[in-house]
Amino acid sequence: MVTHGKKYQDAIKLLDQSAAYAPAEAIDLAKKMSAAKFDETVEMHLKMGLDPKNATQQLRGVAVLPHGLGKTVRVLVFAQGEAEKAAQVAGADVYGGDELIKKIEAGFLDFDVAISTPDMMSKVGKLGKVLGRRGLMPNPKSGTVVPAEDFKKVIEEARKGRVEFKLDRSGIVHIILGKASFEGQMLLENMTSVVDAIIRSKPTGAKGQYIKSAYLATTMGPGVRLDLRAVSAMGGV
């Protein structure tokens, strides 16, 4: 049985667990219930009406948060030759080809986003076990496998707050919206960007209710149930 400390128990007293809150109200409540000694992350969890085993119902995409994630993002680029020089000019924190791959195989993971040119992917693929489980593997569907001329745009997006989302095996999408220290309006605008991107990425094989439930929570706080109608309206549907 899971037990929670006094701070959690005090926080949950502020929450009506039978209610579904409007996004702005839920954000304010989640911020009030954030009682950890560190700046907690604010996350949204969406239960989708999708079958993770159905190839026509896969959900994966990218959202750019207008107010970022509240942290410095280190960007790595896999590239060689002229493309490696382009990565340097575009402002990548780490860049390289074969030697960089060896460095990662040896344990280097001091980066938050990985980008690759298409020609490097046959080599980068062998890092699947290392990068894949950490959500760092470059992927064309998430816009991180690009030609050198797109490096600047993708790197700038990553630094501004580019976040990837993907349906997990339980049919849930987990996505970070920012920090508990953010102003409520900043988190609301980040949430709007995320919901809009998820709705725009609706798979062709989706049937029935697309978003079945939505919750907001800080790292150590209780989940706040969101009003589905209000959430869906954020994406213009």
UniProtKB/Swiss-Prot annotation:
Keywords: Repressor, Ribonucleoprotein, Ribosomal protein, RNA-binding, rRNA-binding, Translation regulation, tRNA-binding. Pfam families: Ribosomal_L1 (PF00687). One of its GO terms (cellular component) is large ribosomal subunit. InterPro entries: Ribosom_uL1_bac-type, Ribosomal_uL1, Ribosomal_uL1-like, Ribosomal_uL1/biogenesis, Ribosomal_uL1_3-a/b-sand, Ribosomal_uL1_CS. GO terms for molecular function: rRNA binding; structural constituent of ribosome; tRNA binding. NCBIfam families: rplA_bact. Belongs to the universal ribosomal protein uL1 family. Part of the 50S ribosomal subunit. PANTHER family: 54S RIBOSOMAL PROTEIN L1, MITOCHONDRIAL, LARGE RIBOSOMAL SUBUNIT PROTEIN UL1M. This is Large ribosomal subunit protein uL1. It comes from Dehalococcoides mccartyi (strain ATCC BAA-2100 / JCM 16839 / KCTC 5957 / BAV1).
